[in-house]
């Protein structure tokens, strides 16, 4: 039996959103690697760079709204401010976590976002996962852990920063989906509303956060044409990365975004080996293979869960609430009464 045309178009759109996210995310990592590494341009101001990203995204959103390419719906300012604060805490905490912890523990903290997102979705939205989904998530976590985790050293400050980063990032990603549903706004509409707030706050606070991280102010950096080109390229890719993130979470869920998002980790490791002569060991290859298998199983498990939900939906439609039964009874009694009255008036 062939799928309806609408389902085919939806599937193509889903694949397109994921492809945009993977390509733009991997591209921005490669651009930032060249921009920020000591062998590149040595631009060590990650938080301020993120401010540039959101400023560029906000500019694109303003142009889109001004030209009528996208509509603007109302979202309360306090919701936008709350979301932006959580998102900015996530960015700053991630940078501090990377500075204070070993690379191995930093990777473990990033992997822990998957179960944390699952738990938060269960607490906030009463979302439950079948055993197949839970098993596939574990396979992905194990696979990515094998290929990325090396030395693991923990300290108190680093642990607190890592916990803050994991919680705030997980909450931010869940909020993207819930805000879109709550106010019936599209992914780009929501992004165009939050980007200006994040841009202003990050451009004001970013240089001070970067000073704490690197001991240098951005004003001391000697700009070159090469660095400016990499910054502009990074900003352009950030627009697509941000849009596709909101698209993917809006279409799927924060959990799916986290699980399938680790395809980016696999791509980054592979491109690092091809373009930057990074070491590729058997451990890396085995871990990537396990992670990919886990992602395939996850996709299958989610599809199985959807089919189960679809089968249970028709039965639910036939069941009526007490209020519906009461209204139906009242309607029948009213009809019977009218028939009796009409019958009495007949000769």
From Swiss-Prot:
Subcellular location field: Golgi apparatus membrane
Topology of this chain in the membrane: Multi-pass membrane protein
Cellular component terms (Gene Ontology): Golgi apparatus; Golgi membrane
Keyword Transmembrane: yes
Pfam family, one: TPT
GO process annotations (BP): GDP-fucose transmembrane transport; plant-type primary cell wall biogenesis; response to nematode; UDP-galactose transmembrane transport; UDP-glucose transmembrane transport
Segments traversing the membrane: 11-31, 43-63, 80-100, 103-123, 132-152, 159-179, 195-215, 223-243, 256-276, 285-305
InterPro entries linked: Sugar_P_trans_dom (IPR004853), TPT_transporter (IPR050186)
Task of the protein: Nucleotide-sugar transporter that transports UDP-rhamnose or UDP-galactose and UMP in a strict counter-exchange mode.
Family: Belongs to the TPT transporter family. TPT (TC 2.A.7.9) subfamily.
PANTHER family assigned: SOLUTE CARRIER FAMILY 35 (PTHR11132)
UniProt name for this protein: UDP-rhamnose/UDP-galactose transporter 1
């Amino acid at each position: 039996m062939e799928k309806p045309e609408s389902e085919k178009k939806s599937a193509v759109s889903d694949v397109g959103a994921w492809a945009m996210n993977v390509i733009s995310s991997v591209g921005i990592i490669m651009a930032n690697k060249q921009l920020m590494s000591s062998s590149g341009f040595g631009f060590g101001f990650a938080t301020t760079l993120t401010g540039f990203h959101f400023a560029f995204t906000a500019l694109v959103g303003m142009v889109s709204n001004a030209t009528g390419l996208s509509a603007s719906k109302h979202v309360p300012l306090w919701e936008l401010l709350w979301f932006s604060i959580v998102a900015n805490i996530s960015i700053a905490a991630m940078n501090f976590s990377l500075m204070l912890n070993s690379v191995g523990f930093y990777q473990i903290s990033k992997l822990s976002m998957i179960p944390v997102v699952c738990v938060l979705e269960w607490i906030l939205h009463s979302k439950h996962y079948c055993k197949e989904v839970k098993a596939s998530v574990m396979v992905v976590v194990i696979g990515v852990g094998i290929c990325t985790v090396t030395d693991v050293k923990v300290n108190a400050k680093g642990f607190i920063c890592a916990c803050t980063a994991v919680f705030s990032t997980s909450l931010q990603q869940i909020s993207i989906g819930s805000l879109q549903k709550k106010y019936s706004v599209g992914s780009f509409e929501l992004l165009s509303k939050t980007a200006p707030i994040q841009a202003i706050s990050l451009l004001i606070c970013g240089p001070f956060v970067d000073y704490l991280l690197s001991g240098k102010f951005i004003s001391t950096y000697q700009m070159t044409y090469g660095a400016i080109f990499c910054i502009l390229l990074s900003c352009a890719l950030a627009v697509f990365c941000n849009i596709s993130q909101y698209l993917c979470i809006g279409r799927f869920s924060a959990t799916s975004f986290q699980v399938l998002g680790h395809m980016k980790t696999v791509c980054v490791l592979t491109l690092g080996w091809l373009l930057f002569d990074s070491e590729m060991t058997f451990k890396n290859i085995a871990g990537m293979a396990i992670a990919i298998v886990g992602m395939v199983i996850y996709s299958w498990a989610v599809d199985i869960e959807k089919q189960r939900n679809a089968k249970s939906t028709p039965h639910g439609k036939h069941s009526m609430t007490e209020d519906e039964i009461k209204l139906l009874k009242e309607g029948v009694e009213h009809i019977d009464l009218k028939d009796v009255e009409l019958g009495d008036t007949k000769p």
